[in-house]
Amino acid sequence: MRGMDEMQETLFTTVKLEDFVPADHPLRPIRLLVNQALKRLNGLFSVIYADSGRASIAPEKLVRALLLQVFYSVRSERMLMEQMQYNLLFRWFVGLAIEDTVWNHSVFSKNRDRLLEHEVVESFFTEVMRLADKQGLLSREHFSVDGTLIQAWASHKSFRRKDGSDDPPPGSGRNAEADWKGERRSNETHESSTDADSRLYKKSKQSPAILCYQGHILMENRSGLVVGAVVSHADGFAERASALRLLDCVPGTHAKTVGADKAYDTHDFVNDCRARNVTPHVARNDARPGGSAIDDRTSRHAGYQMSQIIRKRIEEHFGWGKTVGRIRQTVYRGIKRVDQHFKLTMVASNLTRMARIMDEVLTGAVQ
């Protein structure tokens, strides 16, 4: 018998959002981890928000929504609010009931900036790492470090002289053609009128110069989790300076090792690491003038070879962040907002990896 093409809605329903989410959905273990970390931030949230006045967006729901934006590559807050209107999975993860009203996108953005002001993402990052440490997933001795370029939300046409002496572009219109042939353009004399914190930089002679930031992460070598992340202005010294800054945040004065690529093979970086009781397992750059700063006393050991193998796993976080987390080109302006988004992306990458590792452990225990 042919069914009728009609829809008859009931006035009441007894189905819960929980019933729509499959029991084996990958967001289920991630949501449990997120909720455990957010519970420990209750004291911070109590300080941030006043006891009286109009209720804001719950910070816990705000953080969950921002994580969804990373997990599902949602390109804007406007699009995120639109999807939360009809996506039951999004509503379940954030904690909105079916009949709850979705927030206005501009209100959501203003509340997001409050998290930036009080460094909530940094605190959330710390709590997620504390959960990983309790599960025995973190190494306290062996680390890897690397950096990547994050293209700024600004064009070359916005890169103008600081003194305002640029000639007006020929032609008319908002996006007139520009010709910089023969003109010397540097960060000392020019800056972007769109994003003044971005810098014109290229990572190699073969690549073009772009307006960008540099993102840096410190990864522990046991489970491949990011234990430190920071965004800096892009220049030739930022990678090594940020690596030392991240190493200084590792607790304890015990001996450690850090793996890195050839860009870190400088005498200053190697000496600074050793002064911190950190053995630099840096890839040797014998083609550098003056030779490599790493000699055979370091590179002959099996631990050095192991660090060189494991350090390449750091690219998995950058790859995930650029294809899923939208850090290939940021949509935010200003180094503080870019730094917040970069840290949130690395937290999301950690959560997916932690959920997968813990699932494998449970599966192995059952077998």
Specify the residue positions occupied by each region the protein language model found.
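Basic, low-complexity intrinsically disordered segments
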Residues: R2-D5, E9-L11, F20, R28-L137, ...
